[in-house]
Amino acid sequence: MLPLRDSVPGRTTPYVTVGLIVANFLVWFWELSSPGVDVHVFRDGYYPCALHGPCHLPLGFHALPWYEGVFTGMFMHAGWEHILGNMLFLWIFGNNVEDTLGHVGFLFWYLAAGVVAMAAQTFVTLEFAGVHAASVPNIGASGAIAGVLGAYFVLFPGARVLTLIFFIIREIPAVWFLGIWFLLQAYTGGISLLHPQSGGGVAFFAHIGGFAFGVVTGLLLAARRREPRQLYLR
C-alpha cells in the first residue's frame, strides 16, 4: 500500500516537516558522495553494540558512541527506495502532527520518537539476535516516522488516505491504512525473531517501538485536548 494524500488539510505551513525532509535528502546526497554509501553507513550509522560492546566491524571502522550514532543514523538511508518511501510518509502524515504539537514541539518530539525507536530495536537485537546482529549498522528515518504514524492514528481517527493498492487507487480510512501497516510490522518482526535470515535488513522493532511511542503520546495529547476547562469562583 502506498499513500498518495490524506484528507486532513494542514492549518499552518509545516516548516519542520519540510525541514526534516530537506535535511534527510541533504544527508543522502552526502552519502552518495565519495567514498560512497556503504562507507558512510559503516562509519556513521548507529550500532546497537555501541551501548555495551564488543562491536565486530569491518577492518578500519569503529562504532560511534551510541549517543552520537542514534542521531546520525536517524538521517541516513541505504538507497533511493528507502529514502523516497520514508519521505513520502513523512510528507503526508507529518504536517498534521506538526499542527497539533507546534513547530518546535514537533521537532523535539520527532527526535524523541527516533530515539525510542532505536532503543526498541537495540533491546530486541541485544536480547534475542546476538553480537553479530548488534554489529550491523541501523539507519533510516523510519523509526521516527513510525512515531508520526502512531500519533496520526489516534489524533485523526476520522481521516482518510488516498492509497495505491497494486494498480488500484482507493480512499480508505486512515485507521485501516495505519492499522494494517502496524500489523504487518508486528507480524514480520515476529517472523524475523524466529527466522533471523528472513528479516531482509529491516528494523521492524524500531517501527513497532516508534509507532507505540506515537500512540501513547498521541493519546496523552488527545486527552489533554478533551479536558474541560476548570471554572473558579471568587
Residue ranges and their predicted role:
Residues 1-234:
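A detector for small-residue-rich transmembrane helices and their helix-helix packing motifs
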